[in-house]
Amino acid sequence: MFDNMMKLEILSKSENESFARATVAAFASQLDPTLNELTDIKTAVSEAVTNSIIHGYENKGDKTVKIEAYIKDKELTVIIWDEGIGIENVNLAMQPLYTSRPDLERSGMGFTVMQSFMDELEVKSEKNKGTKIIMKKIFNN
């Protein structure tokens, strides 16, 4: 089981990304993270939510991005998913600088950022069914 959990659903609008980031950070603060750890979590959540909005739903603001966070012992698990277009090749998408939308002038560093700021990252996706991102951060304090 888990010690605590939260759930949040937001419309796929870019203005909701900061709310999602702040909400997960507030939830994580019960683990007494350092300022750097909190910044890492906020950045990773921001990247995942932005990916759902821009790539999963192609900026269609009437869809739902779902976020859950769980605390067990000293570990935070954050799950962010959409029911968007999915990722055809997850391994390719996780390569630094890869972007499926070069027309948007994005850097293609979202998954790289998530990997570097969290202790674990798992991406599950199915074409035309959506993407689920599972991230973990372990606290040693």
From Swiss-Prot:
Q: Which species is listed as the source?
A: Clostridium tetani (strain Massachusetts / E88)
Identification of the protein by name:
Anti-sigma F factor
Which family, according to UniProt? Belongs to the anti-sigma-factor family.
GO terms (molecular function) for this protein are: ATP binding; protein serine kinase activity; protein serine/threonine kinase activity; sigma factor antagonist activity
Enzyme class, UniProt record, top EC level? transferase
Role of this protein = Binds to sigma F and blocks its ability to form an RNA polymerase holoenzyme (E-sigma F). Phosphorylates SpoIIAA on a serine residue. This phosphorylation may enable SpoIIAA to act as an anti-anti-sigma factor that counteracts SpoIIAB and thus releases sigma F from inhibition.
In short, the EC number is 2.7.11.1
The protein's matches in SMART domains, at most eight in alphabetical order, are given as: HATPase_c
Which Gene3D superfamilies is this protein grouped with? Histidine kinase-like ATPase, C-terminal domain (3.30.565.10)
In the record, biological process GO terms are: asexual sporulation; negative regulation of sporulation resulting in formation of a cellular spore; sporulation resulting in formation of a cellular spore
Catalysed reactions, as listed in the record: L-seryl-[protein] + ATP = O-phospho-L-seryl-[protein] + ADP + H(+); L-threonyl-[protein] + ATP = O-phospho-L-threonyl-[protein] + ADP + H(+)
Task: Fetch the InterPro entries from UniProt.
Answer: Anti-sigma-factor_SerPK, Anti-sigma_F, HATPase_C_sf
Keywords attached to this Swiss-Prot or TrEMBL record, sorted alphabetically, are: ATP-binding, Kinase, Nucleotide-binding, Serine/threonine-protein kinase, Sporulation, Transferase
